[in-house]
Regions:
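N-terminal targeting or signal-anchor segments and their processing/structural boundaries
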Residues: 21-24, 53-56, 81, 109-114, ...
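Right-handed parallel beta-helix/beta-spiral solenoid domain characteristic of secreted/periplasmic
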Residues: 1-12, 212-214
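Intrinsically disordered, low-complexity segments enriched in small/polar residues
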Residues: 15, 45-46, 92, 103, ...
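Glycine-rich loops and low-complexity Gly/Arg-rich segments
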Residues: 23, 41, 52-55, 88, ...
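Right-handed parallel beta-helix
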Residues: 1-6, 22-38, 44, 55-69, ...
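Acidic, glycine- and Ser/Thr-rich low-complexity intrinsically disordered tracts
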Residues: 169-240
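Extracellular beta-strand/beta-solenoid scaffold signature
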Residues: 7-20, 38-52, 69-80, 97-112, ...
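Feature targets compositionally biased, intrinsically disordered low-complexity regions
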Residues: 4, 34, 38, 44, ...
């Protein structure tokens, strides 16, 4: 399914939860979603939860998501609800969240008896996101941060051309990092450990570093085939 947001009457998110109730899982698979950078509808974000809703899961898989500038909201944005599980898996995400955060999950935990949500971000190619200003966050996640926190995994992702950090929040749990690859990530704190004594809560991927250019085939056309054999053999990014 292809969802063209460029001619929407409003710039609301593609998915906007407006009723405080319990929802079954939202399962997005093998789709394309896009908005306009200019000359059309500039979307606020991908999803938005600003009510006390309980959502079993949000699964975003095997999809192309691009040109969602996030004018007025963050990319994956939950403010008052509780998503039990967020899975972002095997997607190509590019030209998004120009000056906004990637995953935002505010602390509404006390309304839901302080559960521990799971966030799994695996095998994605993320290019030119959070790249309009320095220091935006991949994980602006604070849900239940004053209690047991969150369970976050970042695995096998290819992250390129960004000025983002992972976080700068004391209430964001340190993710489990494994086999992520980076190129032209210009803010060194994306790799920095936390220093709670100095209130520097980077929670970065200390095993990561900027590597070689993956040499995408034709990124302007949405083709992120990896041309660098040394990067390709690491099995990072989306397999599309």
């Amino acid at each position: 399914m292809i969802v063209d947001g460029t001619k929407n009457a409003t710039n609301d998110q593609f998915f906007n939860y407006k009723t405080a109730t319990t929802y079954k899982a939202l399962d997005i698979n093998n789709c394309e979603f896009y908005g306009a950078v200019s000359g059309g509808t500039v979307m606020k974000g991908f999803y938005y939860v600003n009510v006390a809703a309980t959502i079993e899961a949000v699964n975003i898989r095997n999809s192309y998501i691009h040109d969602i500038t996030c004018d007025g909201g963050d990319m994956f944005d939950c403010r008052k609800g509780y998503m039990k599980t967020l899975n972002i898996n095997n997607n190509i995400i590019y030209n998004c969240a120009k000056e906004r955060d990637f995953v935002r999950y505010d602390d509404a935990a006390k309304s839901f008896n302080n559960p521990v949500p799971e966030i799994n971000i695996t095998n994605n190619t993320i290019d030119n996101c959070m790249n309009g200003v320095n220091g935006k966050r991949i994980l602006y996640v604070r849900f239940n941060g004053k209690k047991a926190g969150q369970h976050i995994k970042m695995t096998n992702n290819l992250i390129t051309n960004t000025q983002a950090v992972y976080t700068n929040q004391a209430t964001t749990s340190t993710p489990e990092y494994s086999n992520n690859y980076y190129f032209n990530c210009t803010n060194a704190n994306i790799f920095a450990p936390s220093d709670s004594g100095n209130s520097l809560y980077w929670n970065g991927d200390t095993s990561g570093r900027n590597g070689s250019d993956p040499k995408y085939k034709a990124p302007s056309k949405g083709d992120f085939t990896i041309g660098n054999e040394e990067v390709s053999k690491l099995k990072v990014g989306a397999t599309r």
